[in-house]
């Protein structure tokens, strides 16, 4: 590097403006530039850095030396070249590894721009070597002129040239020649290419190899990847100081070479005609490495005949990577001549962050033979490589990608200067930069630039082989692991062959993407490019681009079935998608008009494809309601129009709920799937469609449709109304239709179903009549035709015409339809296809008995559903027959639980009969109290069946058939959870006692497994829980019953009947019988309305669940649920409303959960006021208001998903506990008042006496053990407490804490109980307080007080106390009552009576 630095000093001294042209010197003198120039509005001035100065100059000089030696012959062909070079302040970039290129570059503000560049150093020498150059006026002032004068003159010429060009060419061309910092309007013809014009400068042939190599090194250092900017920046209108060397754009450096092939136009101020389009190419110094590598592996240049292909032909050609061969030349570029029919093509790359400019001058065609020779030379040295095709398949949308690009690659070859770790400019220009040439494109000359030294002399390669299926921004985000292997050898001459497995590294492209400067430039480019879209040749872009891109993708990745539309959704940068879609018809959109079929079998709708990955926790609180619910009518179509089609509904629909969509599908004969099954035909998608369902639907090939498309699918099958202009089977001119009078015999209308050539009619009996033509001129219908008269065509005499075909869709002759309605009385399925089993076909028809009893299962095979449960139940019964010892784990009873009407009782009876048991059934209507059950069941095991006494003798053997047959009995207790009231009190406890010692099976049936009445019974029974049978299991049996009874129903009607009965088979059969006896005709349309008119009994828990889930639109339905049990349903709502997850849609979206709960609680508080008024004042007229405030309003706020199962109201338990404790306090108060020690009220008893008594009843036992027993008994006697009062005091004072008796030893507890029960205590008995006799005179109240034997002798012998006791008769209770000697009552010493012994001292 030191040696290179020494070599660099010479070119600086040779040129007077070298201090301004070189990068380092330009950075040092940045303050000398005029302030306030417009270029500073775009770029910020950064600090100078001269670290890489020597290396750059050395490389430039060496490169120019080599290029002059090899391409001396091509120096004569150089044209005027303007170079805009973007330099970056980096050092030793040539030594960086590919991994270093991937690392983000340091974000720097834009450097100040100098008008001169490193190439000005050798401008005089280039003029000498270029005798044919006549465009000296186009060059800026060279070395001798001062910097300010040179800038002014250059800006003046550029400004004039731009003004002149605007009048003769498109707006993009004028901006191309202008001296603005960003030539943006030149982009508009190619919306995928960003044009940046930093320095407009005359490009001449370098003097020495030193300057050429220095420039090469300088350009290599400035190579970087750009991401498309976002923010707009103000476009300068003032004089712009155009520095000669570099301007940085978010650390991404490029050189843009403008090649003007019109060498004859020597006047710089002369406007450029439209045919003379400048060619602007991005030039980077390291392209010398890149192009040599490409030279060996790129495609063979096309022959002149191939370059004549038009845009339409490119759709059939495979996209081939165009080789780059112009880097071999060091002379000014002689661009490809293009006919004036083709406008200037500028590619604006929005999807890709590459900023590139391409413009082609289409006038010059000279020296084409020499260029073709150069191409043939390249052809020999660079054979076609198939991997180049895949390399060209980038997802960057380039308008023209065909073989004609090969003929233009020479003019764009200087653009191949980007590092291969990113998307190089040469990648863009080689493949897509030039549109197909319609004529005159056969003479192509490789472009030769002084900034690209010869590869043969300096074979440095930096271009790597990029093998990518298709370049797109989406793949950048999706596949960051696709990397590009870049081989960089700064000073080696070895050529590295490209690897076919190398991938394009998309990660590097977006380095420095967030720079505010980049975003500002990008927005400015987008804004200005939109204004020039009208100048784009749309036909030569969209067709070519989309076709070739698809072919490239299919070739590179045949298994990639993902469309670009889907990959865009997965991207992280929405900026590129918005920009690419903002061009409308003029933009090249990868998703627009695909001409190559993809491997997806499903045609997805743009509305159905989600734009973002749905959040899995989005509907954690419930799915929202449709935003436009109720805005669309239900579809009407032909019967069974969806038969044979399977649908899957996903997402939130616009108008219908998910259940409503399922109902519509089933109504018209379709099937609903819950997941993406193989037979799936359609996925009806809404907002936030499920990701797994969407992927599964695509895999199975299902078509993705929206809600509107689904409704249209049904509506379009509806028969069209009668048209008076229909043509018939007789070809007639189309005259004015004349209506005919309606005959009186017409009794019903008809509906047009299809457009056929005959008129199909039905007679009054419903039999289809023959097809008859309608005669014209008869003034009416034929006599044999039933139905309304239809307008017929008036024809010439005798000519007949037929009206549109008519078909009656209603089977009953009395039913009529109009042309806009559909008759649906005919079932979707043929009743002939229903198979009636033998067990049903043998039953006589009619309504003599209930169908439930008539069609009750006769064998176990007739039971629908739960086969495994019944099999296990049969095995349990088998153990009672076996002689082997019973399993100890087997219990003596079984508990069959499940919803009503699913066959619990029928299964129990059938299985008992099958296993040889005689069932004794106790139904809920029977008395099942403790005494009644004991009376009925205690001696069942000893009973004998009456049939045993009537044995029959076998004629063959002469023995009694029943003699050796043992009769077994099973007890069936149906609806065990229905025990209630005093009549059944104690029945469950008695049953449990019988089960423990029973020698026969007990079969208990219940509906509510979680009922508190069954809680104790569950511990002694084997649980067998039955489930509701599915619709498929039940529908076949219900259809068989309906067919046997002569009904015409459809599977849809059966489903509605079954679901309306809450999966109750018994109720469904009753409903079918009701429909059969009714005179009303039922069909798919009116069956739902008819079923809603029927009342069904539901439990309070089911009613509360439906209220919490039901939509607020039907208040009457919610009130019906409330009145099912108006005392319990509000309590269930109050218990579970806090646990319900609101849906969050509709009106709920305006509030958060806390606000919704608060408003629901306020409504419940108001309802309590109405409930109190109803209970105390008997104001039953407030009951509907109570239902609204307690159920409807709270459920409207928190409607959603309630917890299942619903919790039982805890209020009832708490109320019961509070009542019990109040009773404890009342009893304690009464017992304490019976003594003369206290007279307190309830509050004082609870607050003061209970804590004190607790301490004195427990602490002596804890501290003194057995010695404290006497003290505890004395306290209890002083206050008249019983043993139950002691336990109640502990319960009242514990409040959920630990039992204080746990600290008392077990031996002390037992001793206390024995001693307390062994002694006599005064007890309180309210019944003894009443006096005997009506008068009550002479009755001693104290006589009624009971005394317990065994009282202490001390109390008996106290005479003084005895007299005091007599005086205090009003006392309710006395501890001891001692009779004096004068008492006449007999003394008893042994009997337990109300008197005690009296002793005298």
UniProtKB/Swiss-Prot annotation:
Gene Ontology, cellular component aspect: DNA replication factor C complex; nucleus
Composition bias type Acidic residues, residue spans: 174-186, 559-573, 1344-1365
UniProt region (Disordered), positions on chain: 1-639, 721-829, 1334-1401
Polar residues biased stretches: 577-588
Basic and acidic residues bias (residue ranges): 1-11, 55-111, 118-130, 227-241, 361-382, 465-484, 499-509, 548-558
GO terms for MF: ATP binding; ATP hydrolysis activity; DNA binding; DNA clamp loader activity
Main location: nucleus
Binding-site residues for ATP, renumbered to this chain: 898-905
Annotated BRCT domain residues: 637-727
InterPro entries hit by this protein: AAA+_ATPase, ATPase_AAA_core, BRCT_dom, BRCT_dom_sf, DNA_pol3_clamp-load_cplx_C, DNA_replication_fac_RFC1_C, P-loop_NTPase, RFC_lid
Compositional bias (Low complexity): 242-252, 310-339, 400-422, 438-461, 485-497, 589-616, 743-765, 799-829, 1391-1401
GO biological process, one term: leading strand elongation
Annotated Basic residues bias: 149-160, 193-204
Localization per record: Nucleus
Function statement: The elongation of primed DNA templates by DNA polymerase delta and epsilon requires the action of the accessory proteins proliferating cell nuclear antigen (PCNA) and activator 1. Subunit 1 binds to the primer-template junction.
Family: Belongs to the activator 1 large subunit family.
Description of how the protein assembles with itself and partners: Heteropentamer of various rfc subunits that forms a complex (RFC) with PCNA in the presence of ATP.
Protein name: Probable replication factor C subunit 1
Gene source species: Dictyostelium discoideum (Social amoeba)
Phylogenetic lineage: Eukaryota, Amoebozoa, Evosea, Eumycetozoa, Dictyostelia
